């Protein structure tokens, strides 16, 4: 099986899956733990345990260039094969990137677009709750058309705590539908600002994207992914679906595409 690794600013998401796109198991490792290839290898071996025996190949997407090579070196040591790294020369993503400087597109955002292209109805908006909150448009033809980057929920909470000395530390939790908009104490007011503030921001951005000219469309669905997807998705208007494995599915699709291409080249030879 393939180990798909999404290297983010906060966590490494590791998922065991097949080239057909099925996902077997998912784990997380703190990005801070990846201080070297050796540290990464130890963390992966400890986290996967006996499941590591099922790993034949690996594919990596990273938005943290400083540790990409650590992860790649670790996986080559684990599998005996060099991993496929999104963004490296010769890797075919199978998707057009229609932005001003395609080489600057975040690997995770393009991989999400591939996942949507392969597994979902298009056009669509991808809403990803990570260190940043991103909204990205994938056109009806499967092309990545650009998007929006806003501060992530946890990042906003941290900034509020740092800048306002009298505000308490706010624990991000599973807010219920009955969370009042009008807070009657400091914590309740902060919770409302974070939760309903983000719901309103996302609804507003989705509405603007859906009302934009082609390649957008008024009825296009929002595909919601990332750790906070279930918390916010149920409050969003229009067609909304949660796909927690979207990035992993995109990585598996890219691996399958490039494996097939190498196989075809071998047959031609």
Regions found by a protein language model. Name each.
Residues 39, 63-120, 236-256:
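Glycine-rich phosphate-binding loop and adjoining helix at the ATP-binding site
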């Amino acid at each position: 099986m393939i180990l798909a690794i999404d290297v983010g600013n906060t966590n490494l998401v590791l998922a065991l899956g097949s080239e057909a796109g099925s996902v077997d198991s998912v784990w997380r490792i703190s990005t801070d733990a990846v201080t070297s290839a050796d540290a990464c290898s130890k963390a992966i071996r400890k986290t996967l345990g006996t499941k590591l025996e099922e790993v034949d190949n690996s594919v990596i997407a990273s938005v943290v260039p400083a540790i990409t090579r650590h992860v790649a070196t670790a996986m080559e040591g684990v599998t005996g094969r060099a991993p496929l790294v999104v963004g490296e020369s010769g890797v075919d993503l199978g998707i057009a990137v229609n932005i001003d400087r395609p080489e600057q597109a975040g690997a995770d955002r393009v991989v999400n677009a591939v996942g949507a292209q392969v597994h979902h109805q298009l056009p669509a908006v991808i809403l990803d709750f990570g260190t940043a909150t991103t909204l990205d448009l994938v056109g009806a033809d499967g092309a990545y058309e650009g998007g929006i980057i806003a501060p992530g929920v946890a990042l906003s909470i941290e900034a509020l705590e740092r800048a306002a000395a009298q505000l308490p530390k706010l624990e991000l939790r599973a807010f219920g539908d009955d969370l009042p908009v009008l807070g009657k104490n400091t914590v309740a007011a902060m919770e409302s600002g974070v939760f309903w503030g983000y719901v309103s921001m996302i609804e507003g951005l989705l509405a603007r994207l859906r009302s934009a000219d082609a390649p957008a469309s008024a009825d296009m669905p929002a595909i919601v992914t990332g750790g906070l997807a279930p918390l916010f998705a149920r409050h969003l208007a229009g067609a909304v679906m949660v796909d927690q494995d979207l990035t992993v599915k995109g990585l598996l699709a890219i691996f399958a595409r490039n494996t097939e291409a190498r196989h075809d080249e071998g047959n031609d030879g």
